[in-house]
């Protein structure tokens, strides 16, 4: 396993410990995905930027009140209570797109390894169609 993948895999258990994913562990795990996406090539630069931007958005919100945002779901609860959960610039949408990107990347990597003859473009197109 390459170094970026190993680093990401090492963070997954901490991110998923407990009934709700811890915010800091989840963000560290998601942040570790950025170099993995970068290693997949220039064609996926928009995904890399999107993942990095959404992680940064969530980190900035958490930094405002770290004691309030202990769980990933605390972001959603806070925005729902304030009536801000539908905002395009909010953490709820950022989290939604971050999770969609993770599903896309998981499917892309699965397809690349399943059929080494397929081009990355074909694998990315099929992954996009499957999960987005």
Predicted feature descriptions by range:
Residues 1-132:
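Long, contiguous alpha-helical bundle segments
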